[in-house]
Amino acid sequence: MADSLSKAERSERMSRVRHRDTKPEMLVRRIVHRLGFRYRLHDRRLPGTPDLVFKSRRMAIFVHGCFWHRHPDPSCKLARMPKSQLDFWRPKLEGNRERDLRLQSELDAIGWKYLVVWECELGHREQLENKLLAFLTEGDSR
């Protein structure tokens, strides 16, 4: 199927796609802040440029969209493979997943812990808060 937009129009439209400060990321940031934790954003020195960074704890949080990052949970309805243009989408989305796994391994190698928050988890606010709190207090002797 041919694209209805010119290459320049498509480029302009795609350049406006937000990579930071998305609604899911903002929600996680508000929850973490309300739990009493302070963080830095998007530290480019770390593999994968995590969304939230807790430098003194050597911890990072990624907020992933289920579709783009291929949420492996089979019950996630947001991670379904598109039905058309599979020759484009399959390598694109599988490449994203492989990159994420590689970057997570790099974080492990330098001694950082990380948590991935999936877009579909945002609807279960209390469970998400508990998950974030458990991750961020892991190893605390308080």
Where are these regions (language model features)?
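Nucleic-acid endo/exonuclease domains
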Residues: 1-142
